[in-house]
UniProtKB/Swiss-Prot annotation:
Signal peptide residues on this chain, from the entry's feature table: none
Family of the protein in this entry: Belongs to the complex I subunit 1 family.
Role of this protein: Core subunit of the mitochondrial membrane respiratory chain NADH dehydrogenase (Complex I) that is believed to belong to the minimal assembly required for catalysis. Complex I functions in the transfer of electrons from NADH to the respiratory chain. The immediate electron acceptor for the enzyme is believed to be ubiquinone.
Membrane topology: Multi-pass membrane protein
Annotated GO CC locations: mitochondrial inner membrane
Transmembrane segments: 2-22, 69-89, 103-123, 138-158, 172-192, 224-244
Keyword list, A-Z: Electron transport, Membrane, Mitochondrion, Mitochondrion inner membrane, NAD, Respiratory chain, Translocase, Transmembrane, Transmembrane helix, Transport, Ubiquinone
Organism placement in taxonomy: Eukaryota, Sar, Alveolata, Ciliophora, Intramacronucleata
Disulfide bonds, paired cysteine numbers: none
Reaction(s) catalysed (UniProt annotation): a ubiquinone + NADH + 5 H(+)(in) = a ubiquinol + NAD(+) + 4 H(+)(out)
Gene Ontology molecular functions: NADH dehydrogenase (ubiquinone) activity
Protein localization: Mitochondrion inner membrane
Stated name of the protein: NADH-ubiquinone oxidoreductase chain 1
Amino acid sequence: MLIYSIVLMLVVTLIIASITLLERKLLSLVQRRVGPNFVGYKGRLQYLADALKLFLKGVAIPSGANSFFFVAMPSLAGAVCYTFWMNSIWGPSLSMFDVEYNIVYASLLSILFGLCVMLTGYFSKNKYSVMAGLRAAILMLNLEIFLGIVFLNVCFLVESFSFAAFAVYQEIFWLIFLFFFLLSNILLVFLLEVNRTPFDLAEAESELVTGYTTEYGGFYFALFYLGEYFHLFFFSCLISVVFFGSWELLKPFLFLHNYTV
């Protein structure tokens, strides 16, 4: 179980790092600029250089901040993000544990991450961080209500909150054909949830103050930075599980469960 946990964390971290590089490449293409092109072949190892810089950078704790909670909040947020992937979203066997109420479990973890964001701004003792933390937390919690109502309707149709039930229900007919217009609204809400353009309300690229992470740097800033991309990747997987046939398309790769604990 310990080995599987370590492998899972490494695989997810590498996927998230690749997503960060892909997003930067796409943004540079849209904005007609070069983008990352120095480290590795055409900049493909840029995420390794960024990670090395962040992990070797020192951490300064503000004099008025609570040192314990200042360090604990990003650590808790990082733990919440990794806990997402211990659920059975990979497949029936490729998970550390399986719970009957997978959708509820994911929603609770998402709400907990929003609380971490709010408390992060509060314990920084910076008025800009406090305002940004409240703004981000209120936005995330309000969106969770909408997502909860939407997924509740879908779960009533499937008569279960389990990812396995969604896989069985969609063996013949995908739910995307029933909830196409609803999915378009969900995608807009997900953009709001993960603070992606044009809904980057909690933190805009044009602002000098980086929201609730204003006082953070180095390793602790990297945890929040990865947390946003964890949400982005997890919500993408969640949409695939709920609307696009679950893990039925991954059946050729399910032989890997023989090599897991």
